[in-house]
Amino acid sequence: MAVLTGTAKIRFGVADTADDMEENTHGHGREEGGIEVEAGVGDVFILPAGTAHKTFDTSPVTEFKLLTPGDGHHILTKGSDVRETLANVQLDGFTMVGAYPKGGGEWDFATGGENRGEYERVWSVPKPENDPVLGKAEEGLCGQWR
């Protein structure tokens, strides 16, 4: 995931335990543990498959929307030109983009719980050929993923 515009808090490693958004965001309606970070433009996060993460307290404040046209499972294009579709995306508010390794299987925008019990499928994401930031460097995914 990479932050393109704005700032936000991101909580990693714990799931919500309450349906109330205020309670699960700022109260105790979530699992114990996890970490919270302040994220800003240029920050990049690489997460192991299946890691819970939640973005909140975004700035500037705007209504939530998917960055790309579609339903969160693929990019809808006019014709078949994904590059043209992406070039026309307007960035505003807090914008973060996510990606999966090439050949890493089906991706989706999950809002929580959809993949419960599907651990083998979630954890079977193959080791990528390149780290998205560090390429094949030992310090990146290629050297650290064992």
Model-derived regions, located:
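Small-side-chain structural scaffolding
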Residues: 2, 8, 39, 52, ...
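Short alpha-helix capping/helix-loop boundary micro-motifs
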Residues: 30-33
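Conserved metal-binding segment of the jelly-roll/cupin
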Residues: 38-59
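PEST-like low-complexity intrinsically disordered regions enriched in Ser/Thr/Pro and acidic residues
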Residues: 25-26
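Double-stranded beta-helix
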Residues: 58-146
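Short, conserved beta-strand element in jelly-roll/cupin
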Residues: 1-17, 46
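Short, solvent-exposed loop/turn segments at secondary-structure junctions
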Residues: 11, 19-20, 54-56
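Short, surface-exposed beta-strand-loop junctions and turns on beta-sheet-rich folds
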Residues: 16-18, 61-62
